[in-house]
UniProtKB/Swiss-Prot annotation:
This is Myosin regulatory light chain 2, ventricular/cardiac muscle isoform. Its main location: cytoplasm. Contractile protein that plays a role in heart development and function. Following phosphorylation, plays a role in cross-bridge cycling kinetics and cardiac muscle contraction by increasing myosin lever arm stiffness and promoting myosin head diffusion; as a consequence of the increase in maximum contraction force and calcium sensitivity of contraction force. The modification N,N,N-trimethylserine is found at S2. Ca(2+) binds at D37, N39, D41, D48. GO terms for cellular component: A band; actin cytoskeleton; cardiac myofibril; contractile muscle fiber; cytoplasm; cytoskeleton; myofibril; myosin complex. The gene is Myl2. GO terms for molecular function: actin monomer binding; calcium ion binding; structural constituent of muscle. The keyword Repeat applies. It comes from Rattus norvegicus (Rat). Residues 24-59, 94-129, 130-165 form the EF-hand domain. The modification Phosphothreonine is found at T52. It is found in: Cytoplasm, Myofibril, Sarcomere, A band.
Length: 166
């Protein structure tokens, strides 16, 4: 497919992406896009991603990892493409339920909390491993209680809603 056709197809096929989200969600995506678009040119490129990772404390991101992220897009990543990519990833998924289910695998008794040391071990040794800095940031933002437990239900609520449960 020629670049012109691909661009036309992308523009035509993505116009309904705005109907997939509520206005508040679109605004949140726009804020995220603006934060990631470090050079303010209206597109997210490799340098923007590297700068975003650095701002989040991940300074040793491999070029291959960034290349893979860029390759997920059908072309230059403007806001519409960014929104379309998230729409495809989130289609049909309730983020709160998805994250809760991931934690529930480690909580067969359904208590709603896990030992912080166990969470630390799992996040640094399994699948998409967190760095020590990422773990430290998480526990700084969501400290365990006095008995060393992490209230993952509240953590998930804050991640997905941006505020604590009443």
């Amino acid at each position: 497919m020629s670049p012109k056709k691909a661009k036309k197809r992308l523009e035509g096929g993505s116009s309904n992406v705005f109907s997939m989200f509520e206005q508040t969600q679109i605004q949140e995506f726009k804020e995220a896009f603006t934060i990631m678009d470090q050079n303010r040119d209206g597109f997210i490129d490799k340098n923007d991603l590297r700068d975003t990772f650095a701002a989040l404390g991940r300074v040793n991101v491999k070029n291959e990892e960034i290349d893979e992220m860029i390759k997920e897009a059908p072309g230059p990543i403007n806001f519409t493409v960014f929104l379309t990519m998230f729409g495809e990833k989130l289609k049909g998924a309730d983020p709160e339920e998805t994250i809760l289910n991931a934690f529930k695998v480690f909580d067969p008794e359904g208590k709603g909390s896990l030992k912080a040391d166990y969470v630390r071990e799992m996040l640094t040794t399994q699948a998409e491993r967190f760095s020590k800095e990422e773990i430290d940031q998480m526990f700084a933002a969501f400290p365990p209680d006095v008995t060393g437990n992490l209230d993952y239900k509240n953590l998930v609520h804050i991640i997905t809603h941006g505020e604590e449960k009443d």
